[in-house]
Amino acid sequence: MFILSAVSSSSSSSSSVPSSLPPFSLSPSISLSFSRVSLPPSSSSSSSSLKLFLPLSLHFTPPKLSSPHSFLRFSASRAMAELIQDKESAHTPSTTDVTRNDPPHSRAFLDLRSEEELLSCIRRETEAGKLPSNVAAGMEELYQNYKNAVFESGNPKADEIVLSNMTVALDRILLDVEDPFMFSPHHKAIREPFDYYTFGQNYVRPLIDFENSFVGNLSLFKDIEEKLHQGHNVVLISNHQTEADPAIISLLLEKTNPYIAENMIYVAGDRVIADPLCKPFSIGRNLICVYSKKHMLDIPELAETKRKANTRSLKEMALLLRGGSQLIWIAPSGGRDRPDPSTGEWYPAPFDASSVDNMRRLLQHSGAPGHLYPLALLCYDIMPPPSQVEIEIGEKRVISFNGTGLSVGPEISFDEIAASRDNPDEVREAYSKALYDSVAKQYNVLKAAIDGKQELEASVADVSLSQPWI
């Protein structure tokens, strides 16, 4: 599971919501810290340096858990203090190795044959002092909710699927409790000796109702993959709905575009690499880790240290883009979509124009051809977020079996929008709004297909739905 948070400026305004959408309330956006960084020009760019205000990342290590009387929650302030202390205590690489040698650890969960044995094992490991009681409570809740969702699918092998997937998940969670994994600003998916990517795919797959799931504009995904193979960079400007977004995106594309599914890099918030129930799933994804400004001042005396540490992630992203052939997913709303509290309707949260513009400028100065595409994702029922953004790490995970949707829109030309406007701020806002409008339109088509039961007939002129797995 993943908590993915996007880059967001602390001062810029958001794109307006299209008039075609009903009014709705937005949860507070998650904004990130910015540092001014000058980057030397690439060989193919001009001699002037690129200066950006862009959110950057710390080198993260998992914070220690607080009182077991709280349910899988710990102080964000304490967590960050320990994180900074760990970072300053040792030099670590900016990019995580793509392998992780499993250290000796309890493998108690792997040989279980029933629900009774699984629950008993959680209690036994807790009594032995190997599991904090709050993590154990989280494991039990995750098991029950996952079991209910898989059984909801009607799969005749639900018993086998639940036990197989949950024993592996609990084994990986316990391993990380015993030997916490440390994420670097640029984390590469760990595929061996244990394949964390395949583990995440297998875990989320039973939650997707593929008969009621759709992909929009499959031909554009093919175009994107061709551009990547030609050395171009591509950034997908997307909405963000659940912790499981990366797995859902990959599962919807694994039949037709496995290269995209496996090589996408996600801009990820600090929660994705701190929550003990999320970390094993995050280890299997390519990440650029960022820290939300919302928590920057939790411990004021550490704020400057964090900002200085953040410069490493900007440099990592810039270097990646200069090498070409990079595919980066980012949600410039600053967090997961939330429903309108008065109607319960879900819509993509507005984009932060500065975040969009920063990504555009990074592409422009990379020295390789770059493209921004609007991407829409509908999957909130699989694992909806809390109704409000929470400060504490750890959240109740409601899980269900449901249809999902993914659609990409045509690339939107910045130059065409800039040609009709003189004010740079107006250009920036107009470009961000154009991307958002495309995402909102695609989202409405997916919503009509899935929630409205229109299926493939929901397709419109510029959003062609398909089900390539059928």
Swiss-Prot record:
Which UniProt keywords are listed? Acyltransferase, Chloroplast, Lipid biosynthesis, Lipid metabolism, Phospholipid biosynthesis, Phospholipid metabolism, Plastid, Transferase, Transit peptide
Quote the catalytic activity from the record. Answer: sn-glycerol 3-phosphate + an acyl-CoA = a 1-acyl-sn-glycero-3-phosphate + CoA
Superkingdom, according to UniProt? Eukaryota
**The keyword Transferase appears for this protein:** yes
* Cross-referenced SUPFAM superfamilies: Glycerol-3-phosphate (1)-acyltransferase
| One of the GO BP terms on file | CDP-diacylglycerol biosynthetic process
State where the transit peptide lies: 1-101
Subcellular location, record wording: Plastid, Chloroplast stroma
Where is motif HXXXXD motif found? Answer: 240-245
Picking any one GO molecular function of the record gives: glycerol-3-phosphate O-acyltransferase activity
Job of this protein: Esterifies acyl-group from acyl-ACP to the sn-1 position of glycerol-3-phosphate. The enzyme from chilling-resistant plants discriminates against non-fluid palmitic acid and selects oleic acid whereas the enzyme from sensitive plants accepts both fatty acids.
Q: What is known of its domains?
A: The HXXXXD motif is essential for acyltransferase activity and may constitute the binding site for the phosphate moiety of the glycerol-3-phosphate.
Checking PANTHER family in the record gives: GLYCEROL-3-PHOSPHATE ACYLTRANSFERASE, CHLOROPLASTIC
State the name under which the record lists this protein. Answer: Glycerol-3-phosphate acyltransferase, chloroplastic
Q: Which organism is it from?
A: Cucumis sativus
